[in-house]
Amino acid sequence: NLIIAYENYNIVRLNPWLLEPDTNYKITIGANTKDKFGQILGKPVVLDYQTGDLLGDISVPSGLNIFPSSQDLQLNISTVNLPESEYQATYKVVQPTDLVYTESAYPRNNRKNLLPTNEKWQKYPVSGEKNKITEVAIPLREKLGSQTGMLAYGVQARTSFSEQNGQEKWQEPEFYGLVQLTNLGVFAQW
């Protein structure tokens, strides 16, 4: 619903997920609008409302994903309005022996990690139209160098900054995951 209003509550909100970014809207509250006391507004109220740009964001599947090698599936990185027009990532082919000491690509203190620290990650440029989601497809077979295998990955980007205690602080979401291409089993999706 576009309008969010609750009974006995004096605030009416617009659902921001239903509005387009960087767009002018004209909002009209009708003259016949009645409050809980039965009072009628009497004449329409017209407001101009300008939405802003989408906040920078990045999204990447995390955790463990298993895909059939018979399909050419890829790892998708979704971005929008990244302020530095780039993300950082690292990829590592996982050997079965690597999984003896860890079961995840997430970094752990005082344990063996599959991936290097994010200071060593490579930067990748992202270009896209403002306020439009850009999909970057990571070719798994190419990264694996094989039709089957497991790949560990980490991805991060600066998305926005805020001020905390008088200092600017970047929001830098991080995503970690493992993706396996296999020719064993049956692929089921639900």
Where are each of the predicted segments found?
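C-terminal segments of large proteins
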Residues: 181-190
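Acidic, low-complexity Ser/Thr/Gly/Pro-rich repeat segments typical of extracellular/periplasmic
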Residues: 1-181
